[in-house]
UniProtKB/Swiss-Prot annotation:
The lineage of its organism: Eukaryota, Metazoa, Chordata, Craniata, Vertebrata. Keywords: Cell membrane, Disulfide bond, G-protein coupled receptor, Glycoprotein, Membrane, Olfaction, Receptor, Sensory transduction, Transducer, Transmembrane, Transmembrane helix. Gene3D superfamilies: Rhodopsin 7-helix transmembrane proteins. Its main location: membrane. It is found in: Cell membrane. The keyword Glycoprotein applies. InterPro entries: GPCR_Rhodpsn (IPR000276), GPCR_Rhodpsn_7TM (IPR017452), Olfact_rcpt (IPR000725). It comes from the Eukaryota. It comes from Homo sapiens. Residues 1-25, 76-99, 161-197, 259-270 are extracellular. This is Olfactory receptor 8B2.
Length: 313
């Protein structure tokens, strides 16, 4: 039962992506296709990396984790989003909302630092190729990955913990298709000052540290590439980084655009722009890394040949 005036909210209503009933069915099929492509693409990459020993390198180790994060990240809210397109009342419990918020933030922040680790990996590969195997040892890769998940856990715990201290009275309609920080803060009937400070600190840290690390890494990378005399060597070095640069641009660019829309006070535009950040980016990542990567394409071709041979015999 939904909360009444002067009572504490135990359930929320997700406003969803659109108020127009005629758009719900087309949007359901659109996001179902996006979700299926995301699942197949990321599961496919995870399987390829697991079965092909020549892909057991630092670069593909980070890419394996990136695919795992995208897989989980997309599964946090997309099934509920699809259900909301076909159900009359988009109700979610307080506990369910906070749980989804926690895992959403955990995977988003972890992906941020995983992309940062990949930038450092590219820096070592291009700027210090002779020391690459020593510098990017299995132990170092494991530590960087562990650090990415720890940062995700810390950020998600801080945000969700502060959200749990808020009281929600009569307003219970979340103007979004998922439980996110800013739409929830608007519903609180108690002071959100602490939450706003935490948002400032956590978001500031999770933007500044990765951005500076990535920027410094690519300054050194570009400088090293420009010092390569042969055109072929320079082209090979650029192609090594191109997929990662595209992934970085999509992730950080769409996130920045989404929060610019939110900060301008336009919740409707904010939640529409967040579709690209939350749904499209996890779908595009496996396509970017598979279509532009020779090793992945070779591994995929071999896997398809094996499947064809099994079907024949």
């Amino acid at each position: 039962m939904l909360a009444r005036n002067n009572s504490l909210v135990t359930e929320f209503i997700l406003a969803g992506l659109t108020d127009h009933p005629e758009f719900r069915q087309p949007l359901f099929f659109l996001f179902l296709v996006i979700y299926i492509v995301t699942m197949v693409g990321n599961l496919g990459l995870i399987t390829l990396f697991g079965l092909n020993s020549h892909l057991h390198t630092p670069m593909y180790y980070f890419l394996f984790n990136l695919s795992f994060i995208d897989l989980c990240y997309s599964s946090v809210f997309t099934p509920k989003m699809l259900m909301n397109f076909v159900s009359k009342k988009n109700i979610i419990s307080n506990v369910g909302c906070m749980t989804r918020l926690f895992f959403f933030l955990f995977f988003v922040i972890s992906e941020c630092y995983m992309l940062t680790s990949m930038a450092y990996d590219r820096y070592v590969a291009i700027c210090n190729p002779l020391l690459y195997k020593v510098t990017m040892s299995h132990q170092v890769c494991s530590m960087l990955t562990f650090a990415a998940y720890i940062m995700g856990l810390a950020g998600a715990t801080a945000h969700t913990g502060c959200m749990l201290r808020l009281t929600f009275c009569s307003a219970n309609i979340i103007n979004h298709y998922l439980c996110d920080i800013l739409p929830l803060l608007q519903l609180s009937c108690t002071s959100t000052y602490v939450n706003e400070v935490v948002v400032l600190i956590v978001v500031g840290t999770n933007i500044t540290v990765p951005s500076c690390t990535i920027l410094i890494s690519y300054v050194f990378i570009v400088t090293s590439i420009l010092h390569i005399k042969s055109t072929q060597g320079r082209s090979k070095a650029f192609s090594t980084c191109s997929s990662h640069v595209i992934a970085l641009s999509l992730f950080f660019g769409s996130a920045a655009f989404m929060y610019i829309k939110y900060s301008s006070g336009s919740m409707e535009q904010g939640k529409v722009s967040s579709v690209f950040y939350t749904n499209v980016v996890p779908m595009l990542n496996p396509l970017i890394y598979s279509l532009r990567n020779k090793d992945v394409k070779v591994a995929l071709r071999k896997a398809l040949i094996k499947i064809q041979r099994r079907n024949i015999f």
